[in-house]
């Protein structure tokens, strides 16, 4: 009996050495528990009107810098937009985002500004911001099915938000 237990321990120890590295990604960074949102929350939207040509320049510029472009549609009136941005400004996340991404914040006002750009990307014009678009280096939207994911940012853990962006890095 003792022999079987020892063999089981060896077997599961071996499995843990093999399985854990497979299930953990190199991108899995855990945030330190002392990183918390700072008040007041950021106001990342400046009211600027963008044209399709501005968006194309942003995408090209980001890709030329070997960064993945992110466009975040939102407004400073929206608590979820501000919470998402505050989370992206936490030191661990900010460092990671700067290394991998270039972000453009597009102000939608009260759904009366820059809405043509949402149509430009063939995203349904639904209310709810922030709308986050993450691109690859060929300008394909990687998260088309989850662009509305962070309209509930206030209900999410900071690590969950961080994991989302880590998973989309290419």
Where are these regions (language model features)?
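Bacterial Sec-dependent N-terminal signal peptides
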Residues: 1-28
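N-terminal leader/targeting and pre-domain segments
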Residues: 28-65
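Extracellular/periplasmic catalytic domains that process cell-envelope and extracellular macromolecules
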Residues: 63-64, 95-98, 124-128
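Solvent-exposed loop/turn segments at secondary-structure junctions
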Residues: 76-80, 108-113, 139-141, 150-151
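Thiol-based oxidoreductase modules, predominantly thioredoxin-like and allied folds used
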Residues: 97-115
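Non-catalytic, surface beta->alpha helical segment in thiol-disulfide oxidoreductase systems
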Residues: 127-170
């Amino acid at each position: 009996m003792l022999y079987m237990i020892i063999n089981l321990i060896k077997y599961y120890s071996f499995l843990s050495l093999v399985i854990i590295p497979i299930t953990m990604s190199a991108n899995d960074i855990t945030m330190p528990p002392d990183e918390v949102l700072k008040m007041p929350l950021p106001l990342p939207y400046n009211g600027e009107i963008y044209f399709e040509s501005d968006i194309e320049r942003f995408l090209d510029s980001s890709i030329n810098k070997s960064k993945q472009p992110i466009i975040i549609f939102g407004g400073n009136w929206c608590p979820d937009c501000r919470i998402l941005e505050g989370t992206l400004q936490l030191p661990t996340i900010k460092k990671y985002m700067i290394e991998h991404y270039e972000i453009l914040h597009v102000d939608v006002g009260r759904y009366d500004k820059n809405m043509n750009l949402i149509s430009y990307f063939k995203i349904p014009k639904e209310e709810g911001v922030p709308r986050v678009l993450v691109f690859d280096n060929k300008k394909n939207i990687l998260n088309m099915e989850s662009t509305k994911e962070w309209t509930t940012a206030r209900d999410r853990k900071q690590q969950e938000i961080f994991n989302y962006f880590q998973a989309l890095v290419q």
